Amino acid sequence: MLQKLGFLPGFNKQVTSTGAESQWIDGENVRFRYGTPEKIGGWNQLGESKLTGAARGLHHFVNKASTKFAAIGTNKILYVYSGGVYYDVHPLTNPSGTAITSAFSTTNGSPTVTLTFGSAHNFQPQDIILFGDATTFSAITNSNFVAADFADKKFMVTSVPSTTTITITMPSNETGSGATTSGGITYFQYYHVGPAEQLGAFGWGISLWGGNILGALTTTLNGLLGDNTNGNNGSATEITLGSTTGFPSSGTNFIQVGTEEISYTGITASKLTGITRAVRGSTRAAHSNGATVTNTSSFTGWGSPAANTDQVTDPGLWSLDNLGTTLIALIHNGECFKWDGDATNATSTRAIIIPGAPTASRDMLVSTPDRHLVFFGTETTIGNKTTQDDMFIRFSSQENIEDYTPTAENTAGTQRLAAGSRIMGAKLGRNAIYIWSDTSLFTMRFVGQPFTFAFEQAGTNCGLIGMNAAVEVDGAAYWMSDNGFFRYTGKLESMDCLVEDFVYDDLNTTSNQLIYCGINNLFGEITWFYPTSTSNVNTRAVTYSYLDSTAKRPIWFTNASALFPRSTWEDSSVFGLPHATKYNPSDDVSFDVTGNTEGVTIYFEHETGVNQQEAATRNYVRT
């Protein structure tokens, strides 16, 4: 006789497979609805282009003409997507452009172009430089490169040999005899965002592999280095560089050439003195004349643990929100910008810096309906980045995002939180703003003058694991902490999770800032995308069904499919369906940035049927 078998919804990975009687223990590309498993919804790529860099922020909003916009912030470029087209609206450090003359140097047979500036620049390796139109270009002698090779094109900075030079890489080699400081053009510099990945405190890992940090200065060797203990140019104890400007000169310092680390104890003109080859666990090797030399004095040695856990490089993150039809965009630990969605030909304009706003903050949001712009982990003295306090909060005056000085006539103000070492993130809720430090939860409520906002600590030992690891749904906040999943509905609750060990036992906690939480209100789901212990990008997802879960049976399920993990997610409130991004670090494409080696991002629309990109997905559940 046939007998109907009943299985509880969700996965239970907290028990052995034999102990999970009448329960599902694993699956891929499935969800649970009405108590039964079904295929997750499909997805299709939006637009024909791929985006440069790793997407780390996504926000939807609408202008007064009902035009829908998606702001997508990658670690390279801030985009606005609308009508199937991506628009580069990234802010420029020099919006009017800067002309340089005697600028280009090339070598026959090489794609490398060296740009020389009339004064010190502040470019870092892998920053983006945009050249002006052809009218700003003057010819380069002894070169086959012409105006069309540069005009209105973006390039990624390949290296920074000195404080007055950078190199870029052309898509083809120089066929002329080679130019020396010839020609000129107008250039525009993109604001620096940060590395694509978050890396731990190991010398090689946190210097240039994941992106430039701490303003790492580069130059070149002036003379080859042999595979021996000597310096170059016949010296046993000195290495001659193209320039030593900016390199530290007191105490023991370090450079990296190729994969070899070298220490030095002094500087004389363009020479490093008192050198020792192959230090900090690196291997000695030969290096050619002109090889890139990087100042690694601020970094921990090869394979050596950092002196403290704060030596972890945050990835290039964005905080995105809107004040009405104006996009507000904050670079994590950097400046804040605005972009007017109602401007004439808005998609042809760029985001601009907000005058008077802090210039270094960890997070940002717009408080509604009172319309204050709030900065978290920000400066105690506006405009002085050295005063950034990771627990300090500053908010603008009501309806004026350029006024932050508290007076008797405005509602601007400040507050410092006490519990924790740094603010990790904040979310706007129905009844309050939720603020998480690395240890605690706080609420921030608008109360009007004279205090404007009231702050209250709502929980301890429940800090936020990463800036984007929390959401708010129907008056309840949900988040992922270092020690489990939590919910706040007026009281703090530790959530029972039947896949908790599976998630936390294989979680890359060094890359905690990559964790991204999103809502799918079409199915009542909250999903956290996270990196496993062997990955520096998000590779898995864990989902909580907030609509169908009960106190006795919380519904959780995971997805380890290589197709599904996302770097950002935004719900369906504006476009009608959820949107998300996937970062592919192994994809190297030029797009419109020559020399991009950091992979690309694809932008998807979800819940479009049951297939991905018109191809079937692998779906199963296992008992």
Which residues are covered by each model-predicted region?
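Beta-sheet repeat architectures centered on beta-propellers
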Residues: 1-96, 195-199, 317-319, 461-476, ...
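Beta-propeller and closely related beta-pinwheel folds
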Residues: 42-62, 90-95, 300-313, 345-515, ...
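Inter-blade boundary loops/turns of WD-repeat beta-propellers
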Residues: 63, 83, 134, 267, ...
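Structural hallmark of WD40 beta-propellers
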Residues: 66-69, 325, 431
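Short strand-coil-strand connectors
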Residues: 75, 83, 256-258, 332, ...
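Small/polar beta-strand repeat architecture
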Residues: 90-236, 242-316, 344-348, 352
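Beta-rich globular "head" domains
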Residues: 121-133, 373-376, 525-528, 617-623
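Hydrophobic or amphipathic alpha-helical targeting/insertion segments
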Residues: 191-196, 324-348
